[in-house]
Amino acid sequence: MFDRWIEDGLQDVLDEEGMGSIAFSPLAQGLLTDRYLGGIPADSRAARGAFLKEADITPARLDVIRKLNGIAAERGQSLAQMAIAWILRGGRVTSALVGASSVGQLENNLGALRQLEFTADELAAIEAVLA
């Protein structure tokens, strides 16, 4: 949701060639989960400075994440589930590469498959938040 460079022509080429694509890090290194809704947890990936940096988690980014979480809640999904469903919408992306550090995270991620469809209003709301 945050890194959409594939939409600038590459996805069209893949469609023309009959090829699928795999979305890497559809949860934005954990940002598109409920983990960062209240800020940066001390034991988080961002606090450790691994791939995700504290500097990447600005108040504006947190505001976007919270708004997306609100849309997800209206859909009856967790933020992670909605983010995965959004990546897989329309069938252009054939797989989403997600990681899980617990069975609970895996089950939550798989829950996205129960509701992959979006209404036009939901997509418009998401686009408005991401703009």
Label each residue range with its predicted role.
Residues 1-130:
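Beta/alpha (TIM)-barrel catalytic core signal, keyed to glycine-rich beta->alpha loops juxtaposed to Asp/Glu
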